[in-house]
């Protein structure tokens, strides 16, 4: 047998082809022997004739003298039974020889398969080709066996169900599968997300329910400072309603006024009624002259220290009639006021402490 010199994968394929040729040659020789055996008895009549001729010959040779008809029939039955037994034994021996030959072929094929797998670098292709060869070989062997077996009666015919070969799928445990969809992982993430959402909602609800003391000044050209207790979740409209209840006792012009007719101005910004104090606290909103999220009041920074230094101290918000603003919006301080815009940044109106940054 010549040895192939070249790549290992090509050597494996060459070995497979040689193995396939050997199997085909063995099948051809097996068929030749089978044809030779069948040619010995050409027809089915000759088979039966030979069988009964042998029985008659043995009966004649074993019968001496005159015998009764019953003895003759009994002896003939014994000879036929013995003859059939010998034929069955020969058939069993022939079947066993065929089985041993098939097992030897299969063992040689498995041995060559292991050798090819040990030498080949392309195991997947080789395995697929070998599996195809195995299937073809199994089909041929099954066909040969069916030809050797006697044809069954029509009442005994059953469909042979061949088992379907399933390829084993091996998984690599080291491969990262985090990008693949995983129902359990997604459900766990959703539960965690929902839990965090509920915790955040509870925290915000607790924050909105906290009390806050708001110092404001009723402005009619001069300031009248008052203080009211509210919740952080209350809106500016609710705050103005409470201010109105407090101021009606002192100011006659407010007795017939509704909260819609009032304005709340803080840090030179007119705050819309639908905003809540919580909105300004959470976003750390700033106005022109100070923070909008601080509602406690200190003395004016311009009175106690350098006005160029930025402070986190806020001024008292102004509560005033909208009619007063319309009459005096061209006069300071109303001329400086403007509606609050959440998209606008008011940082440029603040002055940093330059001396502090140098230190």
From Swiss-Prot:
Pfam family, any one: XAP5
Single GO cellular component term: nucleus
InterPro entries: FAM50A/XAP5_C, XAP5
Biased segments, Acidic residues type: 123-136
Stretches the record annotates as Disordered: 122-150, 339-359
Molecular-function GO terms, alphabetical: RNA binding
GO annotation terms (biological process): chromatin organization
Matches recorded under PANTHER family: PROTEIN FAM50A (PTHR12722:SF0), XAP-5 PROTEIN-RELATED (PTHR12722)
Family statement: Belongs to the FAM50 family.
Full protein name: Protein FAM50 homolog
Organism: Drosophila melanogaster
